[in-house]
Regions:
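Helix-loop-helix hairpins and the membrane-proximal interhelical loops
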Residues: 9-76, 128-149, 236-248, 405-460
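Low-complexity, proline/glycine-enriched hydrophobic segments characteristic of transmembrane helices
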Residues: 17-20, 50, 54, 290-426
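Interfacial loop-to-transmembrane junctions
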Residues: 23-28, 458, 502-526
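Transmembrane alpha-helical segments of multi-pass membrane transport proteins and ion-pumping complexes
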Residues: 74, 78-89, 115-128, 154, ...
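Short, non-helical or kinked segments that cap or interrupt transmembrane helices
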Residues: 86-97, 101-104, 168-180, 274-281, ...
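Membrane-interface alpha-helices at helix entry/exit sites of multi-pass transporters
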Residues: 100-113, 461-465, 503, 507-514
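Hydrophobic alpha-helical bundle architecture
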Residues: 167, 451-487, 514-518
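Glycine-rich, mobile lid/loop segments that gate access to catalytic sites or pores
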Residues: 171, 179, 183, 187, ...
Length: 540
């Protein structure tokens, strides 16, 4: 009995006769008008929401300089997400375009809409995971000149690298240069203050993020290849393994599968990648307008009462574990520990003292919304140091607390995170608009590379569906665990994996370029951001 599955050489032959999609059609005037209308509306909405938040806290504006710096920083951060949109999301639409499942411009708009929804419905876990990589002293003083230099340096470095790889048509990662830029700023900051360069980065967090970025293309390649082989074994419909004929769309069920996976990748990309910009925007807002954004002022008053109660029992447990007197400056002890990861005998008493101090302050105010504007920044900084110290102590096994004390510490950390790790709706909307509109600009270069230059023959339906499915699930899983991952690397390596599994052949010139970009991105971004940080600290 013969199998109904097409042999690999037959698939390759059929793929070679496929018709390429027409990508040169320009959008009409109405499309351009809608694009700029949405862009203008988003900017005006963001500006209005920002001013409304400042008005709500009753703060008097004495100088417009912080708002000018804030505006520039926010535009650069949103610019990063805009570039991220057309740089990364082109990968999501390449398969539906090259299989004629959707017309090119409709596919791009469709992807942009689901990127938008992905950002709006994201959890925020990735956003604050990115911030944890930054040097602690710059996080605590992000509103200073050095803090602005940090933000400008890492964002400009990431944008320049993304634009460079896009210009060359390379589907390189947008996450890689951002992580490299953060590391570069941390190393430069440490060296400029006379410390070992490695002390400027939380290498435990950086390693965790690095594994997710470095392993994701390998996962994409292997899993997409295995999924294609499993499809050939289990699904006997020959139409699935053919390349498109002419400009005709595929059978309805194949078309639906490809559109579904494209939609899933777009949504997952928005949910994961959009958070990187949100995290940096929140860092900027907290540094420049702490009275409005340092603490979540929308939390009900009973949450403040619970916060104070948990702080009190946590302090008592810590004092019981280490009854020695608290140091004169507990904040400095915790700051030194968070920066150096070296525990001193004063660490636990310092943590107990600061925990009690935070609890008493919140209890005295009665609600987070009643914390005075001039105290907001200090209260948040104390909370940040306490939360990070608890996280690192738990990770490193410092203190050897009993189960009850560990539980109280984690409960208090969760209360702190609830009060400090929040993202206003307008920030999500602004990032969603930037990422969604970016999806609709400049996508052709990357689409051509993914659709034509990775494998020798034309992409088949099964190959497109396999690569997209693996990308969707991988990015979704990373988002669930709060890890940044590269949509580009997962999907382009998935396409390569299906070509290899099918015996179709790879275009090794493109593969070499992709590997070179993969290897060079981190060191190049580190060097570029470190240089920019040094230069900007001299100018500010």
């Amino acid at each position: 009995m013969t199998s109904d599955v097409l042999p690999a050489d037959a698939v390759a032959s059929a793929a070679g006769n496929a018709h390429k999609p027409h990508l040169e059609q320009r959008p009409g005037r109405l499309t351009a008008l809608v694009f700029f209308a949405v862009l203008a509306t988003g900017l005006l909405f963001s500006a209005y929401s920002l001013m409304q938040d400042v008005d709500d806290v009753g703060s008097t504006i004495t100088t417009w300089t912080p708002f000018l710096l804030l505006g520039v920083a926010l535009l650069i951060a949103l610019g990063f997400e805009f570039v991220n949109g057309f740089h990364d999301t082109a990968n999501a639409v390449a398969t539906v375009i090259y299989t004629h499942s959707l017309p090119p411009h409709f596919a791009v708009v469709w992807s942009g809409c689901f990127n938008f929804l992905g950002v709006l419905l994201s959890s925020g876990a990735v956003a604050f995971g990115i911030i944890a990589l930054l040097p602690v002293e710059l996080i605590l003083q992000v509103g200073s000149s050095a803090g602005f230099a940090m933000v400008f340096a890492l964002l400009i470095a990431a944008i320049l690298w993304n634009l460079g790889t896009w210009w060359l048509g390379l589907p390189a990662s947008s996450s890689h240069p951002l992580i490299g830029s953060i590391i570069g700023v941390g190393v430069a900051n440490a060296l400029m203050h006379g410390r070992d360069g490695t002390s400027g980065v939380d290498w435990g967090q950086a390693t965790k993020v690095g594994y997710s970025l470095l392993l994701s293309p390998l996962i994409g390649f292997a899993c997409a290849a295995l999924l294609l082989l499993a499809l050939r074994l289990l699904v006997k419909n020959r139409a699935l393994y053919k390349a498109p004929k002419g400009k005709a769309p595929p059978p309805w069920w194949i078309r639906g599968l490809l559109i579904l996976t494209c939609t899933g990748v777009s949504f997952a990309h928005g949910s994961n990648d959009g958070q990187k910009g949100m995290g940096l925007i929140m860092l900027i807002l907290v540094g420049t307008l702490p009275m409005a954004y340092a603490l979540n002022r929308t939390m009900p008053a009973d949450q403040a009462v619970q916060f104070a109660a948990v702080a009190e029992v946590t302090q008592q447990a810590l004092v019981k574990s280490a009854p020695q007197p608290a140091p004169a400056d507990p904040r400095q002890v915790l700051s030194d520990y968070v920066r150096s990861k070296q525990a001193s005998p004063e660490l636990i008493p310092a943590l107990a003292a600061l925990t009690g101090s935070i609890g008493q302050e919140v209890k005295g105010y009665g609600a987070f919304s009643r914390v005075p504007a001039e105290a907001m920044g200090n209260v948040r900084n104390d909370m940040y140091l306490t939360s990070e110290a608890i996280r690192l102590m738990d990770k490193d096994g410092v203190g050897r607390f009993d189960a009850d004390t560990r539980g109280k510490l984690q409960a208090f950390k969760q209360k702190i995170d609830d009060a400090t790790k929040f993202i206003p709706l307008w920030v999500k909307i602004a990032v969603a608009i930037a990422l969604g509109l970016g999806t609709m600009v400049g996508w052709k270069r990357i689409v051509v590379t993914v659709g034509e230059k990775i494998g020798k023959p034309h992409l088949t339906y099964a190959q497109g569906a396999s690569a997209e499915t693996v990308a969707m699930l991988t990015i979704g899983a990373a988002d669930l665990y709060g890890l940044p991952v590269s949509t580009t690397h997962v999907l382009s390596s998935g396409v390569a994996g299906t070509m290899a599994a099918n015996g179709s052949g790879l275009q090794w010139k493109t593969i070499r370029n992709l590997l070179m970009a993969w290897v060079l991105t981190l060191p190049a971004a580190i060097l570029l951001s470190a240089s920019l940080y040094w230069l900007l600290t001299r100018l500010f």
